A protein has these predicted regions:
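N-terminal helix-turn-helix
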Residues: 1-74, 78-79, 239-247
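Sensor-regulatory modules in signal-transduction proteins
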Residues: 202-205
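Short, basic/aromatic recognition patches
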Residues: 81-88, 153-199, 244
């Protein structure tokens, strides 16, 4: 692991449960000398990623708020999702439409829109969720590269077995292949009681998994309505987002001299 990776890894320590850290506590947690921990914290503060809060404590810094605003306004996935979900929402009835993307060995809810509903779902924006449970997560998992799936199985075999995805590598691989072959994935009360979910994959311009689009709705709707018709709407939305993301060509780098 490079020194940059170790320094940025410090940010993972900050959470709702532990929003403030001292240099000494960070050094102890990450196995760093005090001088190294101090240097990392100093550099992160300089970049605006951390900020002092008094008493020797540090919290996440204002640069993160700035980056969040930029992501909300111009991120290709969120821009495409906003336009698509706005059109889709009146057609799906009671429930919540949300987008999740992979982050490390978890998934992160990054955007949602909702019709009036009584649901209480775990996928609130910015909250990491398990990779092996819930259709929004598993549909992403199924499309990850095989090399990454092998590593995930080595490191999380017990969790994978508990989630019903296979008791050995072959069974795990075959389960994901079967999921990958389907146009959508459903889940009933897998994370939240009373919630039925329909998820479809979203891909980037190169055909790699980028995110999932999910409709979460009251479980009773799945017992009374045509799930396939609702799934067609989710698939339509996922395809539209995929196409919109692919249409946004990367910017050509600007030569340093031309920026003066």
């Amino acid at each position: 692991m490079s020194s940059l990776e170790r320094m940025l890894g410090i940010l993972d320590a900050f959470s709702e449960a532990a929003p403030v850290w001292t240099v000494d506590a960070l050094g102890e947690t990450f196995g760093l000398s005090r001088s190294t921990a101090y240097r990392y914290v100093k550099d992160l503060c300089k970049a605006g990623l951390l900020a002092p809060v008094g008493g020797g404590g540090y919290s996440l810094g204002p640069r993160i708020i700035e980056l969040d605003r930029q992501i909300r306004n111009v991120d290709p996935l969120l821009t495409a999702a906003r336009d698509t979900l706005r059109d889709l929402l009146p057609r799906v009835g009671e429930g919540i439409l949300f987008i999740c993307g992979p982050r490390g060995d978890a998934v992160l809810s990054v955007f949602l829109m909702e019709n009036p509903n009584t649901l209480d779902i775990s996928y609130s924006r910015g909250r990491p969720m398990p990779l092996f449970r819930g259709s929004a997560s598993v549909v992403i998992l199924a499309h990850l590269p095989e090399g990454r799936l092998r590593r995930l199985y080595r490191e999380h075999a017990a969790v994978i077995a508990k989630a019903g995805l296979g008791n050995d590598w072959i069974a795990f691989r075959n389960a994901l292949r079967a999921i990958r072959a389907r146009p959508y994935l459903t889940g009933r009360a897998q994370l939240d009681p009373g919630v039925f979910a329909i998820s479809a994959p979203v891909f980037d311009a190169d055909g790699n998994i980028l995110a999932s689009l999910t409709l979460a709705m009251p479980e009773h709707r799945a017992d009374k309505e045509d799930v396939d018709s609702l799934a067609d709407l989710v698939r339509e939305g996922a395809a539209r987002i995929t196409a919109a993301v692919a249409s946004r060509a990367p910017l050509t780098p600007v030569a340093a001299g031309s920026m003066r």
